[in-house]
């Protein structure tokens, strides 16, 4: 099924569809056929298209976009091998970037602009992938049932006083795998396992749904506390629906671990594929994402924090106030992803 948006974009609803042109309706390519770049994106078209439109308008480089789930895109790239049309792989969470890199799907690139604009902890040390936006894993809480001062750290959520009061999505999701990995790096394998066990014992229900569902569960009284990515709360804040306004009116968010290592953060990021046929254009696209215009568009649309520290967050995101982020090199989380999955399985986080 194909839909044309008001901006002139064509949406690919299923991953099996062929590549579709993503360009402003008013833009008629007059450049050579090689002036294009093919993107596989794990983020939905609506969350990336405005950035691609601005890139095409500024550079004249046409963007061909295919969207799908991270695992599907990685499998597709592996299957296509040297014959892949993809020049860029864009996805959420450092765990997905690490898996792609470990599978040999990225090539190292040397870009002065990317090195200058993106802090080292948010990019691959070998130049194979680069963070493009930041999200925090925050604690959402019921304002009428939980005192803000009663919340402090991720570790505290394993305390028995939270028994039957916490909701969180499945550990099969990479967001939680990376959170477990951050606990493991901070405290070691044994302590991380005890934390997972305690958290599972405190769950109000079996893990289900996405992060927005966890926030709604807190608002409805099914739980008092949830662990979610910050941008899901941002989407509800930006919504014009009465139902969503009611949710955010009753639910607050807190950045944990401000007294020690800081809040766990993660990224959306991208890299140039190992067999990119339009390498130069691919690098230009990543550089555009890291530019002031690209950062404002991408971070604002997604209610995330810019990875370029010179760019201010959107008013909605800025409204949460400043916070201390964990300074851990995010590449480390990818290394410990397998251990995180093992701990989740061992201690029953389904």
Model feature map: region roles:
Residues 33-98, 350:
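Early extracytoplasmic/lumenal segment of secretory-pathway proteins
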């Amino acid at each position: 099924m194909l839909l044309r948006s008001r901006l002139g974009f064509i949406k690919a609803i299923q991953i099996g569809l062929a590549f579709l042109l993503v360009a402003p309706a008013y833009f008629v390519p007059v450049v050579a056929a090689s002036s294009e770049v093919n993107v596989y994106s794990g983020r939905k078209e609506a969350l990336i298209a405005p950035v691609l439109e601005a890139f095409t308008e500024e550079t004249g480089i046409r963007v061909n976009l295919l969207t799908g789930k991270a695992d599907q895109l990685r499998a597709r790239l592996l299957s296509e091998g040297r014959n892949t049309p993809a020049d860029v792989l864009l996805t959420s969470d450092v765990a997905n970037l690490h898996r792609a890199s470990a599978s040999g799907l990225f090539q190292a690139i040397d870009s002065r602009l990317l090195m200058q604009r993106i802090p080292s902890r948010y990019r691959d040390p070998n130049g194979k992938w680069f963070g493009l936006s930041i999200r925090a894993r925050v604690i959402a809480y019921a304002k009428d049932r939980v005192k803000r001062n009663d919340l402090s750290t991720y570790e505290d959520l394993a305390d028995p006083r939270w028994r039957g009061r916490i909701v969180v999505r499945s550990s099969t999701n990479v967001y939680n795998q990376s959170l477990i990995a951050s606990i493991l790096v901070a405290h070691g394998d044994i302590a991380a396992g005890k934390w997972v066990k305690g958290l599972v014992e405190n769950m109000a229900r079996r893990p289900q749904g996405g992060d927005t569902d966890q926030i709604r569960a807190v608002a409805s009284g099914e739980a008092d506390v949830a662990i979610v990515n910050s941008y899901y709360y941002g989407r509800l804040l930006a919504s014009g629906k009465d139902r969503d306004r009611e949710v955010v009116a009753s639910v607050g968010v807190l950045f944990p671990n401000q007294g020690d290592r800081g809040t766990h953060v993660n990224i959306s990021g991208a890299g140039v594929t190992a067999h990119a046929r339009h390498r130069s254009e691919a690098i230009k696209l990543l550089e555009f994402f890291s530019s002031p215009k690209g950062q404002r568009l991408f971070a604002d649309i997604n209610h995330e924090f810019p990875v370029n520290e010179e760019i201010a967050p959107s008013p909605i995101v800025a409204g949460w106030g400043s916070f201390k982020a964990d300074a851990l090199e995010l590449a480390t989380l990818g290394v410990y992803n397998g251990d995180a999955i093992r701990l989740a399985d061992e201690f029953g986080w389904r």
